[in-house]
Curated annotation (Swiss-Prot):
Name listed for the protein in its UniProt record: Cytochrome b6-f complex subunit 5
One cellular-component annotation, GO: chloroplast thylakoid membrane
Organism for this UniProt entry: Cyanidium caldarium
Family: Belongs to the PetG family.
InterPro entries (alphabetical): Cyt_6/f_cplx_su5, Cyt_6/f_cplx_su5_sf
Keywords for this protein: Chloroplast, Electron transport, Membrane, Photosynthesis, Plastid, Thylakoid, Transmembrane, Transmembrane helix, Transport
Coiled-coil ranges from the UniProt annotation: none
Disulfide bonding pattern of the chain: none
Function: Component of the cytochrome b6-f complex, which mediates electron transfer between photosystem II (PSII) and photosystem I (PSI), cyclic electron flow around PSI, and state transitions. PetG is required for either the stability or assembly of the cytochrome b6-f complex.
GO BP, one annotated term: cytochrome complex assembly
Location (main, coarse): plastid
Membrane topology value: Single-pass membrane protein
Length: 35
């Protein structure tokens, strides 16, 4: 049961990190377009 919980936490962290990177990349792209 603990392993499943740890796996879920790790996957969630990776997912959040990917979302953050995607959002940052989008902001950079939009900024480059406007400048």
């Amino acid at each position: 049961m603990v392993e499943v919980l740890l796996t879920g936490i790790v996957l969630g962290s990776i997912f959040i990190t990917l979302l953050g990177l995607l959002a940052a990349a989008k902001l950079q792209y939009n900024r480059k377009k406007t400048n």
